[in-house]
Amino acid sequence: MASGVQVADEVCRIFYDMKVRKCSTPEEIKKRKKAVIFCLSADKKCIVVEEGKEILVGDVGVTITDPFKHFVGMLPEKDCRYALYDASFETKESRKEELMFFLWAPEQAPLKSKMIYASSKDAIKKKFPGIKHEYQANGPEDLNRTSIAEKLGGSLIVAFEGSPV
């Protein structure tokens, strides 16, 4: 079911910047986004970047000790959101970084909000080609390291964001 909701150009630009890793200076790397949260505009017609809801790579280890915990804390308790998270994890063979797309639809969110976000999900996903990992979370219990590691590769994952799973 399509909702007719549009996706802002800035959302597409942020996705591209997160997906494409260029050879960058240390300063440019610090400005790269680790996580970004998207919401519907006030008129509910466009998916936009939620103001102030991002984590920069340069903040990790400086002002943010646990980026995933901080990311989960940025999600509203009683409304839906979309998010991109640049997950860093280790398998038994190697260290990887891959983008994850989240639909956050908590149980306490209004039914209308859940319906609009669910029906608009395809619109934003079409703007994010190549996303390997998509995850819908309905509460904080769905956003723990174990469930995310399971989604990323199950028993092959030994650490997520530097912490063992």
UniProtKB/Swiss-Prot annotation:
Transmembrane segments: none annotated. The modification Phosphoserine is found at residue 3. GO terms for molecular function: actin filament binding. Keywords: Acetylation, Actin-binding, Phosphoprotein, Ubl conjugation. CDD domains: ADF_cofilin_like. The modification N-acetylalanine is found at residue 2. One of its GO terms (biological process) is positive regulation of actin filament depolymerization. The modification N6-acetyllysine is found at residue 19. InterPro entries: ADF-H (IPR002108), ADF-H/Gelsolin-like_dom_sf (IPR029006), ADF/Cofilin (IPR017904). ISGylated. A motif (Nuclear localization signal) lies at residues 30-34. It holds the Pfam family Cofilin_ADF. One of its GO terms (cellular component) is cortical actin cytoskeleton. Residues 4-153 form the ADF-H domain. Belongs to the actin-binding proteins ADF family. Actin-depolymerizing protein. Severs actin filaments (F-actin) and binds to actin monomers (G-actin). Acts in a pH-independent manner. This is Destrin. It comes from Rattus norvegicus (Rat). The lineage of its organism: Eukaryota, Metazoa, Chordata, Craniata, Vertebrata. The gene is Dstn.
